[in-house]
Amino acid sequence: MHSLISSDDVWVLWGFIAVWAAVSIGLEQRFKWASAVSGAIIALAGAMVFTNVGVLPVESPVYDTVWSYVVPLAIPLLLFQINVRQIFKESRRLLFIFLISSVGTVLGSILAFFLLKQHIPYLDKIGGMISASYIGGGVNFAAMAAKFETPGEYVSATVVADNFMMALLFFILISIPALKWFQRHYAMPFEEKVKADGNSGNSAESYWKRKDISLKDIAFNAGAAFALVAVSMKVSGYFKSIFSHPLLTGTLGDQYLVLTSLTVLIIFLFPRFFERLNGSQELGTFLIYLFFVVIGIPADLRLIVTNAPLILLFVFIIAISNLAVSLAAGKLFRVRLEEILLAVNATVGGPTTAAAMAIAKGWRELVAPIMLVGTLGYLIGNYVGTFMGNWFSSFL
C-alpha cells in the first residue's frame, strides 16, 4: 500500500522513529496530561495515526531491525539495576496469574470459535494459531501456521488483525491503572511507589531526574549489553542446532530467555560493578521507546477493513476474554493489578511487550520476572495451539 515514506527509505524511517520517540518522552515530561497518558501511549498512538494517514509504510526492514537488534540490547540495559533476589520472589506470583491468563485465552478461543465458525473459513486453523500465539507469542503463531498449513492469504489477514489487536490491547492495559474504579478495587503497590517517587509536579519528569553520567558509564553499559546479547545469540543458536525436541528448543534455544537468564546470572555474580553504572535505565528506556513506535505502525485500519474485519472480531473476543478472566481471578485471589496486566500482556503480546510495558510504567521490579515467566508461554503455547486446532477441526 502506497505511503509518503517508502519502505526502503531507511534513514528517513530511522529519523522518524527516533524523533517521534524523543517527542513522546519530551511531551510526557513537559505536560501533566501527557504524563497521565504516558509517553508509551503517545509513541504508539502517534505511529498508528501516521500509518493510517499514509505517511508511514506498514512494513519495512527498519522495523525488523528494531525487533532484531534494538529490543535485545534494551533488555540487559534495563536489568542492570535490578535486585536478583526480588526477581524470584515476584516470579512466583506472576507465574500463577500468567497461567490464569492462559486459561482466559483458551476460554476466549472456544467462545470466539463457536460464535464465528460459520462465517470465517479455516477458523479451526486460525483458532489453533491464535490460541498458541495468545499464550506464547509470534514464534508460536509461525509454528502453528506451518503445522496446520493455513493458506497464506488467511495467515496474512490474521497477522494484520493480530497487529491491530495488540496495539489496541496495549493501549487498554497501560491506561487501566489511571482509572479510578481499578484504583479503588485492586491493590497497586508498584504504581503507588512510582507516584510517590514523583509526588511533586510532573511524575514522569520527577521519576527521570537528571543524573551524573560519564563516558565510562556509557562505554561500560554499551559494552556489557552488546557482549551479553552476542553471547546469548550464540548460545541459543548452538542449543537450537543440537536439540530437536520443541520443549528444549523452546527453552534453551530461545534467545530472549537465554539473554534474560544470562544477564541475571552476571548481575548476581558481579553486583557491585552494575550498581555503580549510571545511565543504564535511561539508555535502555529510550531504546524501548523506539520499539513502542514500531509496534504502533502495523495497525493499519485500511488493511483491517479490507482484509480482516471478522478475524479482528475473532481475536478481539479472545483478547478481551483473557483480560476479563485475569481481572476476575486476580480480584478473587487478591493479585496485584500490575501483575495481572503484565500477565495479560505477556500472554497476548509475548514477554518482550510485557517487559516494555513494565518499563514504561516504571514498575522496574517486575521487568525481569515478567520476562522469565512470559517465556513459559513459548513452551506451552504450541501444545495448547495443537490441541485446540485439532479439536476445532472436529466441528467443521
Curated annotation (Swiss-Prot):
Predominant cellular place of this UniProt entry's protein: membrane
Tagged with keyword Acyltransferase: no
GO cellular component: a single term: plasma membrane
Cellular localisation: Cell membrane
The keyword Amino-acid biosynthesis belongs to this UniProt entry's keyword annotation: no
Membrane topology summary: Multi-pass membrane protein
Superkingdom: Bacteria
InterPro entries linked to this entry: DUF819
Keywords linked to the UniProt accession: Cell membrane, Membrane, Transmembrane, Transmembrane helix
Residues spanning the membrane: 7-27, 36-56, 62-82, 94-114, 159-179, 218-238, 250-270, 285-305, 310-330, 340-360, 367-387
Pfam families the UniProt entry points to: DUF819
Protein name: Uncharacterized membrane protein YjcL
Organismal lineage: Bacteria, Bacillati, Bacillota, Bacilli, Bacillales
